[in-house]
Amino acid sequence: MKAALVILDGWALNPDEGVRDAVAAAETSNFDRFWNAGGHGTLVTSGRRVGLPEGQMGNSEVGHLNIGAGRVVVQESARVTDAIARWRGEERPDPQGDGAIDDNEAVLSAFDYAREHDGRVHFMGLVSDGGVHSYQSHLHALIELAAEEGCEAVTHAFTDGRDTSPTGGEEYLTELEAHADEQGTGHVATVSGRYYAMDRDENWDRTELAYDAIVDRHAGHEADSAVEAVTDSYDRGDTDEFVEPTLVADRPALEDGDSVVFFNFRSDRARQLTRMLADIRAEAWGGRTDPPETRVVTMTQYDETFGLPTAFPPIRPADTLGEVVSETGHTQLRLAETEKYAHVTYFLNGGREVEFDGEIREIVPSPDVPTYDLQPEMSAAEVTDTAIESIEERDPDLLVCNYANPDMVGHTGDFDAAVEAVEAVDEQLGRLVEAVRKAGGHVLVTADHGNADDMGTEDEPYTAHTTNPVPLIYVAPDGTDGGRLVREGGALEDLAPTLLELMDIEKPAAMTGESLLE
């Protein structure tokens, strides 16, 4: 074995000692041992260094794209923002040739279809400024564009509470309804928490509840306004993420001849509802739905097999880490539990549904629990067991392994559970690093973004990602730093070049990142 990249998802280093920091509070003897014995430093995982707007927190998709590409990958969120800015008359660089949003063929086709069929345009997506799955400003622009195009529009609002404050939905929906009043269109027809509308683990019963509200106007709750929908939910003890699908006022359902514009720019949590609305592979949920004849447009490509019009098609970086490792005749193992499996495969491979020659994939099922604070250890031990077994039996040249716990449990806002999650990962980190070393491999330990390093307060839990620097530890096969120093000022784009150096593979010209070892 030559090298391993171990990603502690959601594990960052918070310089502020005055916050509830689950990473700092946890007993992390293995991490501390490797930090002290190996070369160590920090990496930037947010803002322009990963292709996001300045100050925007990173996330797992962005992180793994940058890690695999070995360069800064301009993110769809920035592309959408810039297209809207051009529509408003601002000058923005346009290396992708996206143009302005009012010239976007896919978006315009939604308006055209609705006009031709005397229908409406239905905007749906996550209504928040979290910036992980969507920006509320993008929705506001679409509503303005609908008014400009003379189309009646309604909104199906999915509330956040995970990448934002658990009760921030009240403010976001207040702003949205005021904007809809101002534009004369785009009012909210349904409200659903992301737990239902944006499930990604094939809990189709949850997705179906959101679908029923949107298509059949059938839900367990009704409200006179979008704001009332969430405040009633708070009274029931459910924060934004868990708002049960609610019908708002007497607004219309999605009907034949209507269009849908799903404005989330991140794909993973938009796929299931999109499949239901477009009737794609309905056997997965027993074919229980019968969607109307509509035109469904997605802001970005949610899945290349869907065949749906896409406003901002993907940019696929070539010569990614996996591709280069494969083309040089080396083998690689990608390993994660369900929650992060797409990240170590699809996103690490540049957002491509491709499995390279010599690429071995192992997926460990995530626990079947409503929220991961109920089982903070998740499947970390099983991930490690699988990794060690694969190292011993297959001896891959490169291992990429993701531990999901600090991120997934951090999102629950439960501080004690997050501490347990960090400690569970630390225990497994010790086992895995020793197994890689025993096989003669170099180890890089890092993270794709922060989360558990800031859990907010008891009264106001913080459930979103952070912009804090993440650790980077280099452990040589002998357990030391191997006489190498970790340079400062690095970012995620520098990990692939570092791994290639450790594997004695020449870095391709397309990778602009630089080795982190001196």
What are these regions (language model features)?
Residues 1-518:
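Feature captures the catalytic ectodomains and active-site-proximal regions of enzymes
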